Amino acid sequence: MNKTIMALAIMMASFAANASVLPETPVPFKSGTGAIDNDTVYIGLGSAGTAWYKLDTQAKDKKWTALAAFPGGPRDQATSAFIDGNLYVFGGIGKNSEGLTQVFNDVHKYNPKTNSWVKLMSLAPMGMAGHVTFVHNGKAYVTGGVNQNIFNGYFEDLNEAGKDSTAIDKINAHYFDKKAEDYFFNKFLLSFDPSTQQWSYAGESPWYGTAGAAVVNKGDKTWLINGEAKPGLRTDAVFELDFTGNNLKWNKLDPVSSPDGVAGGFAGISNDSLIFAGGAGFKGSRENYQNGKNYAHEGLKKSYSTDIHLWHNGKWDKSGELSQGRAYGVSLPWNNSLLIIGGETAGGKAVTDSVLISVKDNKVTVQN
């Protein structure tokens, strides 16, 4: 009898270890956004187009349910956050009424109770793409991202060039062959108050802005990890925003994913351990840039990291690996762990699965 019970226990443990974290997303999902509220996950945009879905993680029969479509058109690199039961979506990259790719600076609100969207009469003072968003004391905070005028101008130039390959090569060379500071990535910190729908200046980085950083916050601290310093060039920097007391303090932690860094990585916290995983970048680009080659990633192949790093005792330790490199998915806090939904793998392939990264006693567990 005891042997039977033991065999059953082993079988159940094996099943749990191999069970999917969440059901596959309804479509391959990358470059979108997502948020979690009361154990219900919401994802949308990116490769899902205007579609949004939700999933109750506590339901016995877990499944994705389609929601009302986003009214602002398909978008990549939007961000989202829940505040007081409503979902707010900030900016992104999409097509304007003339069919040109552009950065948006608008805000949409979704009401889960009525399954309805509304575009707010509120525009951020700068474009929002490649930015990060986090919530602190009932307000949304936005920082980082590309410069709206420079980014939009690049795509206007490409549109003018049409199919003229010579003109396109010239435009690309002109766009990428500049120093990082010449792209004016956003280093300002903006706050959005949903009660007034107003934007305010909340501070600025003493260093530089990034695009495609990973963000995670807990209590009065928020961490911005890696990201682009300019198009094609990542940074290995880690910034900490400390809201303790009345004055916001910016701190710089030891770098991670050195020397080249990554963008589109995933960040979370498990049992008070800060986690950074995945991301994509160009190996050798940092050396090229330091040697005076501004078009630092020219001719280099994008690589996808499998590394999982933990911040421990004041330094980063590589503590595990993903089953495959991935980037540009959604990372959310769930079950005291880091939940990764979707993303892209080598070649830019969008995926439908989820990954759960947990930490206990500085040991990493990865569940696919």
Curated annotation (Swiss-Prot):
**Entry keyword set:** Carbohydrate metabolism, Isomerase, Kelch repeat, Periplasm, Repeat, Signal
Pfam families, alphabetized: NANM (PF24996)
Q: Does the keyword Manganese apply?
A: no
What is the annotated localization of this protein? Periplasm
- Active site, per annotation: E228
Q: Which reaction does it catalyse?
A: N-acetyl-alpha-neuraminate = N-acetyl-beta-neuraminate
Which Gene3D superfamilies does the annotation name? Kelch-type beta propeller
Signal sequence interval, chain numbering: 1-19
- What's the chief localization of this chain? periplasm
The Kelch repeat boundaries are 40-84, 86-137, 139-173, 174-219, 222-265, 287-336, 338-367
Q: Name one GO cellular component term.
A: periplasmic space
What Enzyme Commission number does this protein have?
Answer: 5.1.3.24
What SUPFAM superfamilies does the annotation carry? Kelch motif
MF GO annotations: racemase and epimerase activity, acting on carbohydrates and derivatives
The record's section on NCBIfam families has: muta_rot_YjhT (TIGR03547), PRK14131.1 (NF010730)
Role played: Converts alpha-N-acetylneuranimic acid (Neu5Ac) to the beta-anomer, accelerating the equilibrium between the alpha- and beta-anomers. Probably facilitates sialidase-negative bacteria to compete successfully for limited amounts of extracellular Neu5Ac, which is likely taken up in the beta-anomer. In addition, the rapid removal of sialic acid from solution might be advantageous to the bacterium to damp down host responses.
Complexes and interactors: Homodimer.
The record's similarity note reads: Belongs to the NanM family.
State the protein's name. Answer: N-acetylneuraminate epimerase
Whichever gene encodes this chain, its name is: nanM
